[in-house]
Amino acid sequence: IKNTLKNIEISQLKTDLIDSKKEDFQIIGKSSQMQKIFKDIGKISTNDHTVLIRGESGTGKELIAKAIHLNSSNSNGNYVQVNITAIPSELLESELFGYEKGAFTGAEKRKIGRFEEANNGTILLDEIGDMSLDLQSKLLRVLEEKKFYRLGSQKPTSFNSRIIASTNKSLELLVKKNEFRDDLFFRLNTLTVDLPALKDRKSDLPLLLNFFNEKYVGLNGQIKSFDEDVLNIFAKYDWPGNVRE
């Protein structure tokens, strides 16, 4: 457990705790679907309510979460991303809330959790639909009371960051199957962003192709442009992996 915790701590701190001002990313699209997304980001960024981002894998949920953070009043705070599916369920609670020295075997010193790292910033809970029911109840308590407890501590820690949750599943269906708490769903469902699949906004394909071409191979002069035949082939493809593919 000790080694697993250490590996998770090192890898996630390297990849997930982001200095937003230095983050280099772009959201590409001029389609009507993406124009609506941009408007949604603008409206959502004016407040600090909880946000739920829904969309298939590869549609850019993480980018949207970062954009909301960057345009919000807490943009100077940390942006922390937690992939629920990447952390073993038995370790997720200590990863989110942190723990005190001696809280369990292997806890040799206090560890700050992900909620605490996001102080005055934003935390993205990626793939919230995979969170256990037990942990869902504790997340609900954080949303209601604006505080949490490190494992092994009786002293509450204040929570003053924005929570953004993302999912590629239907939380409504999970609620009906008693696999997701309805009260937590209502808390998360305050503001929503629904991302379209790439097959539903193929008019953005030329923009995306040019963007990735310039980013990855254009600097070497390997590809100047795409032939019409190539564009037609891409347009006929349904891109099941979406923009990530």
Question: PLM ranges: what are they?
Answer:
Residues 102-109, 145-150, 173:
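Short gly/ser/thr-rich secondary-structure transition/capping motifs
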Residues 13, 37, 59, 82, ...:
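Conserved RecA-like P-loop NTPase ATPase core
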Residues 26, 39-106, 116-132, 197-202:
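Conserved post-Walker A coupling segment in P-loop NTPases
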Residues 110-120, 124, 132-138, 149-168, ...:
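AAA+/SF3 P-loop NTPase mechanochemical coupling elements
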Residues 17, 68, 72, 88-91, ...:
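Hydrophobic aliphatic residues
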